[in-house]
A protein has these predicted regions:
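C-terminal accessory module of base-excision DNA glycosylases/AP lyases that mediates lesion recognition
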Residues: 1-28, 92, 99, 110-116, ...
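Structure-specific DNA junction-binding interface
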Residues: 1-84
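Non-catalytic, well-ordered alpha-helical scaffold segments
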Residues: 36-44, 56, 89-96, 132, ...
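Short, amphipathic alpha-helical segments that act as regulatory/interfacial helices
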Residues: 42-47, 59, 96-99, 180, ...
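Short alpha-helix boundary/capping elements
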Residues: 46-54, 66-67, 103, 142, ...
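Secondary-structure boundary/capping residues
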Residues: 55, 67, 71, 104-107, ...
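Alpha-helical ds-nucleic-acid-binding substructure associated with the helix-hairpin-helix region
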Residues: 59-124
């Protein structure tokens, strides 16, 4: 067995309770307020090329100052920049524009793939990775969040030969199938495997 695979299985065994609790939190997210769900979307809009903790801190700061729903682009960009979120001006614009969909985020199709396509079509700043991340964080199942950590992990275990330089829709969907099958082979859900691989790279179960 590949050393990396052994490590993943060990992490899953050691952190299984924590992982299951986190997945339950995701499942319960759509029962929360519209602002809570919108905050999760904004977190995912902020994550490209930015540490998850930095993005999370920025969202928390905006909510504390009542800016997430009401702040202008400049106010939001300033907080993003202060917290180390890359491309703050662009992402601030995405957050302001996404407010138009605040009330519709709880009414997406129940099918994860249909929900993802709708998000990508309608919300500027969301690609396959970001839309998958949001949907996983509000309880959807069966999607892969193919960020650089996950892709490097896939290379380590031999699922892919190289980390692609760019992810077209076709490439994303092809690699997603491989990731989902790999999770199944390990006896995990794709959602659990994602958290395991993140814990392997960062030492913590986050989101």
């Amino acid at each position: 067995m590949n050393d990396t695979v052994s490590r993943y299985l060990k992490i899953y065994e050691e952190k299984r309770k924590e992982i299951e609790e986190r997945l339950k939190e995701f499942k319960d997210m759509l029962q929360k307020s519209d602002e809570d769900v919108f905050a999760e979307l904004c977190f995912c809009l902020c994550t490209p090329q930015t540490r998850a903790r930095a993005a999370d801190a920025a969202i928390s700061s905006m909510r504390a100052k009542n800016l997430l729903l009401n702040g202008n682009k400049d106010d939001i960009a300033a907080i993003l920049k202060k917290n180390g979120v890359r491309f703050p001006e662009s992402k601030a614009g995405y957050i302001v524009a996404a407010r138009a969909y605040l009330k519709s985020l709880k009414n997406l199709p129940s099918n994860a793939f249909e929900a993802r396509e709708r998000l990508i079509k309608n919300i500027k700043g969301l690609g396959y990775k970001e839309a998958s991340h949001f949907l996983r964080n509000v309880g959807y199942e069966g999607l892969a969040i193919l960020d650089r950590h996950i892709l490097r992990g896939m290379k380590e275990v031999g699922i892919i030969e190289e980390v692609p330089k760019a992810l077209t829709k076709r490439t994303y969907l092809k690699l997603e199938k491989k990731f989902v099958q790999f999770a199944k082979d390990l006896g995990m859900s794709p959602e659990a495997l994602d958290l395991v691989m993140w814990a392997d790279k960062t030492g913590e179960v986050f989101k």
